[in-house]
């Protein structure tokens, strides 16, 4: 069947449905009522009558509602689904009034109906409602995709997510699990004594990460503003305030950068700060959180992702970045003393590095190129270069490294954490240096956040900070190959493109 034929058939079906809608308006009146009272969801009905034996009819009258997914024998048998599950509807001249049966020819797959009737279980063991009353609640003007095949076009699944979920039980389950995971993160953090706050999504100065922001303009304030790339600086100001010693936020960040199977310009992060803790405390927190989430979704800490079996049972492997690079490439960065020596060693090993790269930039680049892909089971990579970590405390005895770790699994970065820098003079020095580097890269709009520095001058307690990429974590826990599979309505090109 070609596209032209398919579009013609779809148009014909739509016209037939429109004619039925016209007749229904004339015969019934309002076929899109504002309210309908059901006594049970389909799942509640199934649970209540779980022990009902086959070929038994009760005297119980119930009212249910849902979308029609299948119709057999001219509507004698229909399956209707609500969000909780399905129930079979039976309409017959011996049990169903003529007024209710008269509606059957007007009902199409995809319509939403309400049904009142007697509960029974068929000889084949199917829980069924013998319809006594049927009401049209929503007339669907478009045909549903074929239930058993769903939407085969992946892009169409993202563009028309409502149809994807309507016809794909895996997609429906995945988004139910997403809700459970996000709620689980929030519950875990609150039970651990963290207070949830909300910080600005619109910011006049963007910071807390190195990324390209989305820019907008506030007409009343006559002020250019940015969608936040991270909540870090505001959360630290909250810590300074003394409102709480343990603060967190679950919300979206926005970065005007590439789209891939692991990147979406709008994504969900959980970021938290814990006064009087350090990065090792944050490692423990990550392990406890991940284990809790795995148990809530799978009932065990071990689960499959693609052809791999992953384990969220702590403790996770911990390895300093210089050690990890040495193990994989043989390059001993701790024995290298200067930036020039680092570039020379990297080039000798076959890596293309920029002529102005520092020791730390060379180390981080080689780690990303050669080591990340080896980190399949959950691992904390610690001791990052200070060059690329302006907000972390130095490792005692090794001023080129900082108390920072990233958590990896399936070769993906899932989390990033520091022993947070709270020395106001060192913080200013590093932020000024970072600003100069940004301006050198052509990021002329980048500004120094003096309000944040003023708060740090006031005094921030020692603290551990952590950010977790919620979408990637959900990908792992739900066996989703693309980030767009776990974002309800992901970024996509316009249809015309």
Swiss-Prot record:
Record bears the keyword Magnesium: yes
CDD domains hit by this protein: LysRS_core, LysRS_N
Binding annotation for Mg(2+) 2: 413
Catalytic activity: tRNA(Lys) + L-lysine + ATP = L-lysyl-tRNA(Lys) + AMP + diphosphate
Entry binding sites for Mg(2+) 1: 406, 413
Record note on cofactor: Binds 3 Mg(2+) ions per subunit.
Keywords: Aminoacyl-tRNA synthetase, ATP-binding, Cytoplasm, Ligase, Magnesium, Metal-binding, Nucleotide-binding, Protein biosynthesis
Cofactor names: Mg(2+)
GO biological process: lysyl-tRNA aminoacylation
Superkingdom as given in the UniProt entry: Bacteria
Matches recorded under SUPFAM superfamilies: Class II aaRS and biotin synthetases (SSF55681), Nucleic acid-binding proteins (SSF50249)
Any one of the GO CC terms: cytosol
HAMAP family: Lys_tRNA_synth_class2
Subunit structure: Homodimer.
Name of the protein in question: Lysine--tRNA ligase
